[in-house]
Swiss-Prot record:
GO terms (BP aspect): rRNA processing
Protein EC: 3.1.-.-
Name under which the protein is recorded: Endoribonuclease YbeY
Obligatory cofactor(s): Zn(2+)
The species this protein was found in: Streptomyces coelicolor (strain ATCC BAA-471 / A3(2) / M145)
Presence of keyword Hydrolase: yes
GO cellular component: cytoplasm
Length: 165
């Protein structure tokens, strides 16, 4: 799996954890091991510009996903998805820090960025949360992936509760 993490935000973030949880999420979703993903960490100003440009919404947001090859998880009878370029995930640590502090289970900026990385990966794979059934499926997968990764890493305490809707 080729995953690049590029921190352009000026904020210190745990890039290794972002890389690790992205790799875990893609493996868990059975994405081809030679697929490519880019994660860019930007400041609030850059995120606001992207949010306006692509969503026509004011203010910065927490995570945006830009799919490339529209890869999907393989069906039950397929071994793995075809190789391809997944796309880009853009994260904003300033928004993540605020959301983590305000979440039902308060958690750190880095924990929020890990959750948002999984959220972004799922969006790249075609998952969405516009409808209640879609939201239940996506957030269920998101929680299972974050919980599995935390267990594998030996992290204790409650997993971060979703702050994106």
């Amino acid at each position: 799996m080729s995953i690049d993490v590029n921190n352009e935000s000026g904020t210190e973030v745990d890039e290794q954890a972002i890389l690790d949880i992205a790799r875990y999420a893609l493996a868990r979703m059975r994405i081809h091991p030679l697929s490519e993903l880019s994660v860019i960490v930007v400041d609030a100003e850059a995120m606001e510009q992207l949010h306006i440009q692509w969503m026509d919404l004011p203010g910065p947001t927490d995570v945006m996903s830009f799919p490339m090859d529209e890869l999907r998880p393989p069906s039950k009878d397929e071994e793995e998805a075809p190789q391809g370029l997944l796309g880009d995930i853009v994260l904003c640590p300033e928004v993540a820090a605020k959301q983590g502090a305000e979440a039902p289970t308060e958690h750190s900026m880095d924990e929020e960025l890990q959750l948002l990385t999984v959220h972004g990966v799922l969006h790249l794979l075609g998952y969405d949360h516009e409808e209640p059934d879609e939201k239940a499926e996506m957030f269920g997968l998101q929680a299972a992936i974050v919980d599995g990764w935390r267990a594998e890493k030996g992290l204790t305490g409650p997993s971060p509760a979703p702050t994106v809707s």
